[in-house]
Amino acid sequence: MALRGVYAQLLNRGPGLRVFRSWSSATAQTEKGEKTQSRSAKPSRPEFDWRDPLLLEEQLTADEILIRDTFRTYCQERLMPRILLANRNEVFHREIISEMGELGMLGPTIQGYSCAGVSSVAYGLLARELERVDSGYRSAMSVQSSLVMYPIYAYGSEEQKQKYLPRLAKGELLGCFGLTEPNHGSDPSGMETRARHNPSSRSYILSGSKTWITNSPVADLLIVWARCEDSCIRGFLLEKGMRGLSTPRIEGKFSLRASSTGMIIMDDVEVPEENVLPGVSGLAGPFGCLNNARYGITWGVLGAAEFCLHTARQYTLDRIQFGVPLAKNQLIQKKLADMLTEITLGLHACLQLGRLKDQDKAAPEMVSLLKRNNCGKALDIARQARDMLGGNGISDEYHVIRHVMNLESVNTYEGTHDIHALILGRAITGIQAFVAGK
């Protein structure tokens, strides 16, 4: 379904959304009128809006703004009310995937197969709005779009695309991506999961385990990477219910609690030959998927950082100590200025990367640069905001501590902060330093 059409439908669903539309229009008209009066009263002078310091809005297309505003409304009105208890109780709401599917937000950059076919920037804007609410929700969407739908689209057969992509796009199926193993995180080349070919049954027998897999306990479709007898790594499509396949949940997380995380355990799981992804072999396959997912993360974490900035700003304006607002303190203003600076620079870098991505000019190192920078800066901002809220900063009702906990994970997964430093170091020097002495 076209996202423009979805936007029109969403706005017509209820009075609350019509109020949002009216408020947005009225606000825009009021601001326009104020600016007009200001220009007539004195010579024209560029105005600074701290909410959009370098005019990101002016660099987006009308469609991108429309898509973002649609999803922002959904996130704030449908997801934000759920997240407090979901995080407290460590509950993943499966229905949000179906809801996002109805909005056309799953696999949105894919052309055809019931997908929206929007720009990479539009996808980034979606990730930003989703992670403004919670990193766990963004993780679920990111896995579905970049780690499940993308490899089927990029490496799958036409039969696989027709069979799975439309149902994944609608949220009827939920997928997961199995690469990380108990003994192999940053070094997937040491993969121990094995796939033995059985010519007589035209199938592969998979044995091994994967861990820290987002969505695995509730997944209908599992993309698993395994080493074949020729030592080549290939991707396999496993379906829920296959004999020998289990996906136990990992309990007791203090991060991404609104996301379902688990293992994939394969005890001689028989997978038909037609379930092998034919278009890729070797680590280029999973790395290509991760590159797409990391791009979404670069946008998403800034949404979380923006939430923390806005919360800290309002709190320090409202909180009176020693007879004045905390925001009157020079140290507080410096912290807010530092936060705003890093978020602004990060967003404009994301915009440039998105445009390059749509032109097929985005090198993996570019993504590593922003994944490393934006995740690290977002975590720093969340920690600062937590501190600025004082004792209230550890209360989940203010949401900032939840973002701190979540960003600790996001700074680690899909390439740790240090691994991305080594990727960039190799690009700078021409020398790989992943293993000392090699």
Swiss-Prot record:
Substrate binds at R138, S139, S186, F287, G288, C289, L290, N291, N292, A293, R294, G415. PROSITE patterns: ACYL_COA_DH_2 (PS00073). Its cofactor is FAD. The active site is at E414 (proton acceptor). Pathway: Amino-acid metabolism; lysine degradation; Amino-acid metabolism; tryptophan metabolism. FAD binds at residues 177-186, 212-214, 319, 330, 387-391, 416-418, 434. The modification N6-acetyllysine is found at K240. Keywords: Acetylation, FAD, Flavoprotein, Mitochondrion, Oxidoreductase, Transit peptide. GO terms for biological process: fatty acid beta-oxidation using acyl-CoA dehydrogenase; fatty-acyl-CoA biosynthetic process; L-tryptophan metabolic process. It is found in: Mitochondrion matrix. It is an enzyme of class 1 (oxidoreductase). InterPro entries: Acyl-CoA_DH_CS (IPR006089), Acyl-CoA_Oxase/DH_mid-dom (IPR006091), Acyl-CoA_Oxase/DH_mid-dom_sf (IPR046373), AcylCo_DH-like_C (IPR036250), AcylCo_DH/oxidase_C (IPR009075), AcylCoA_DH/ox_N (IPR013786), AcylCoA_DH/ox_N_sf (IPR037069), AcylCoA_DH/oxidase_NM_dom_sf (IPR009100). Its main location: mitochondrion. Its EC number is 1.3.8.6. Disulfide bonds: none annotated. GO terms for cellular component: mitochondrial matrix. It catalyses: glutaryl-CoA + oxidized [electron-transfer flavoprotein] + 2 H(+) = (2E)-butenoyl-CoA + reduced [electron-transfer flavoprotein] + CO2. Residues 1-44 form a transit peptide. SUPFAM superfamilies: Acyl-CoA dehydrogenase C-terminal domain-like, Acyl-CoA dehydrogenase NM domain-like. GO terms for molecular function: fatty-acyl-CoA binding; flavin adenine dinucleotide binding; glutaryl-CoA dehydrogenase activity. Homotetramer. Belongs to the acyl-CoA dehydrogenase family. Catalyzes the oxidative decarboxylation of glutaryl-CoA to crotonyl-CoA and CO(2) in the degradative pathway of L-lysine, L-hydroxylysine, and L-tryptophan metabolism. It uses electron transfer flavoprotein as its electron acceptor. This is Glutaryl-CoA dehydrogenase, mitochondrial. The lineage of its organism: Eukaryota, Metazoa, Chordata, Craniata, Vertebrata. The gene is GCDH.
